Amino acid sequence: MNERKLNKDFLEIYEMSISGKIKKEDALEILKLDVYDLLHISYHLKKAFNKEKIETCSIINAKSGFCSENCNFCSQSIHNNSKINIYGLKSKEEILKSAKSIENYSNRFSIVSSGKKISEKEFEDILEIIDEIKNKTKLKVCVSLGLLNKSQLKALMKKNIRIHNNLETSKNYFKNICTTHEYEDKVDVIKNGKKLGLQICSGGIFGLGEDIIDRIDLLYELKELNVDSISLNLLNPIEGTKMREKINSKEIKSIEPIDALKSICISRIIMPERVIRLCGGREYVLKDLQSLSLLAVDGLMIGNYLTTSGRNIQSDLRMIEDMGFKKG
């Protein structure tokens, strides 16, 4: 392909993306481009929406393990055999201490709880913890608390915080990773939250054995739900999970770095105006290519994840700076 033709194709994709005219079949064709071409387009789309800053976020595993759901990738499920720390909801003091420790490095701090749902007592405790963090730090607070009901969503709306609820994968593929709750259960939480005016962060995991059509379907589901922030995770197959067994037995293949980058880029091209946030598994999958992802994303989770260790925070902040971006 000569340079003139390439530039014409870039411009056409760029303009289609800006105007929201990228269809599923277009996305599949665009993915045939070289990864560096996709990164080029993604970067210019970022610039078009003034996304020169990288919003950092961090999480605390506030309640760990003993989850009733059978998500085959999750080390916290009782249906898997991962060796993790199991504990109930941490105290207000512990969670506040964690928030303060990250305050100078992160824009957002999310309280994450294991399990399908939390009890009303736990929910009331978390509302108090939210107030404490908002009063004593400058962090924006988020929560990831499973399948929240309408009453809980209303209470969180009054606190003016963002909720997180991952769809994980496409509706069609979901039954391959979880059978103890329905895809629509998650969709309902997001829809109910949006109706109330809550900000929503949702996304999925690439590398669960899904095909590219499943990834595209997931992205369009997120687009149609109009979520504010798209959280992209890359599978880190944790020892003891059913997903790790599938990879060890060659039933499914681990996602390759270039494949992951292309999937991140198409997320930006489909939803150029949204926050595209790269989260868990980036160290494991992208390895030395992590910095390239910043050409497409404008959000980055830093610090440790739920049951796995993240990269050194200073290394991530230096990577952001070295790539010419600012923490925002």
Swiss-Prot record:
Checking InterPro entries in the record gives: Aldolase_TIM, BATS_dom, Biotin_synth/BioAB, Biotin_synthase, Elp3/MiaA/NifB-like_rSAM, rSAM
Positions annotated to bind [4Fe-4S] cluster: C67, C71, C74
Which cofactor does the UniProt annotation name?
[4Fe-4S] cluster; [2Fe-2S] cluster
Listed EC numbers: 2.8.1.6
Q: Which reaction does it catalyse?
A: (4R,5S)-dethiobiotin + (sulfur carrier)-SH + 2 reduced [2Fe-2S]-[ferredoxin] + 2 S-adenosyl-L-methionine = (sulfur carrier)-H + biotin + 2 5'-deoxyadenosine + 2 L-methionine + 2 oxidized [2Fe-2S]-[ferredoxin]
* Record family assignment: Belongs to the radical SAM superfamily. Biotin synthase family.
Query: What interactions and quaternary structure are annotated?
Result: Homodimer.
- PANTHER family, per database record: BIOTIN SYNTHASE, BIOTIN SYNTHASE, MITOCHONDRIAL
Q: Quote the protein name from its UniProt record.
A: Biotin synthase
The scientific name of the source species is: Methanococcus vannielii (strain ATCC 35089 / DSM 1224 / JCM 13029 / OCM 148 / SB)
